[in-house]
Structure formats: C-alpha cells, structure tokens
C-alpha cells in the first residue's frame, strides 16, 4: 500500500501552518484515507534531526556568517535529500499520508526566482535530492506581497523573511509560474480562514478521492 504526499506552498504569511493544523484533524475523518493509515506532518527545511541543524544554518539572523546563495541552495538540497530518504518515502511506503509545509517548489521560487540562481541547476538538484519523488497534490496558497507584509508586521523575521518586498515579489512571481507549469491547485489565501479550509478540503476531495 502506498500513501499520499500532500504539499502546501506559498509566500510567507499565507497561512500554511494554520491550514496544515486543520488538515491534520480533518483528513483522518474525511473518508479519503484507508483504514490504518496515519497522517505524518513535516516541513522544509527541518523535517528531520539533521534537517533541523540545516534549518538553523539557513534561517538564523545572528551576526554569524550567512550562507552564500549557492551554498544556501546546496543546504536546501541536502535537507531535502535527507527528508525524502529518511522520513517521506518510508512513511509513504508504510501507507501513511504525508503533509509537508514546503517542498521543492519553494526552492525554485525562493532561490531560482528570488535569488536569481540558475533554474536548470536547481531542477537538476531537485531530481537528485528527491530521487524522482513528487507530491500527489500541491496546494498553493496564493497571497499578494502587500497582504503578506501586512500580516507579518511586527513579527520576528528569519533571514529569508527579512529580504524585503522586492525579493518577495520575485518569489511570488515564481510561485505563480510554477503553479501554472506544474498544475498546482491554487487557493486564494486572502479569504477568511474558514473559507480557505473549505477550499482546501474541496481540492483534496476532488483530486485524492
């Protein structure tokens, strides 16, 4: 029995964390999952013990040396390779359902579009790190940069979040293009939380039933 792999993507402040918590409660009672399957919740970066150390290197905001853009890309790839091999693929092989807060699309959006790194290189690294594993469904929570900045006003920012509006605009453009080219399911994240929940449930019922 093979499980299902669900990914939520979107710019900072789009509400992924809130919606994932809802899906953790909703999925086991949705009628979608087979009997005996569990829901595994994870994230990138930082879904494994090794990944948590990598996450600290990637996102810290101290005065320590920050990773150069290419080094940053390699760290994300290392995190993903460990994540897929030690957590995601074993869970799917057990028949469990995996929900991940971000996956390879975020690397293309943030490092490819945001940083301007070679997207062909990023896609080659993606193939290596994932060993060909792809989500069964990617749910893109679409949010404007203006709304993202407003929602996060006053919040403590990590190193990536602190990049500013111009960087985030490029990232948002990247997500939009990826959603089109990879047939992601787009959900407007500027609605009420309950409306977003209902839209996500509809997408999952439609695509995974």
From Swiss-Prot:
Establish whether keyword ATP-binding is in the entry. Answer: yes
Enzyme Commission code: 2.7.4.9
Sorted keywords for this record are: ATP-binding, Kinase, Nucleotide biosynthesis, Nucleotide-binding, Transferase
Catalytic activity of the protein: dTMP + ATP = dTDP + ADP
Disulfide bond annotation, renumbered to this chain: none
Q: What class of enzyme is it?
A: transferase
GO BP annotations, alphabetical order: dTDP biosynthetic process; dTTP biosynthetic process; dUDP biosynthetic process
Q: Which GO terms describe its molecular function?
A: ATP binding; dTMP kinase activity
The family database entries (Pfam families) matched by this protein are listed as: Thymidylate_kin
UniProt: ATP binding residues:
10-17
Q: Which NCBIfam families match?
A: DTMP_kinase
PANTHER family (UniProt xref): THYMIDYLATE KINASE, UMP-CMP KINASE 2, MITOCHONDRIAL
Role description: Phosphorylation of dTMP to form dTDP in both de novo and salvage pathways of dTTP synthesis.
What is the designated name of this protein? Thymidylate kinase
Q: Which organism is it from?
A: Synechococcus sp. (strain CC9605)
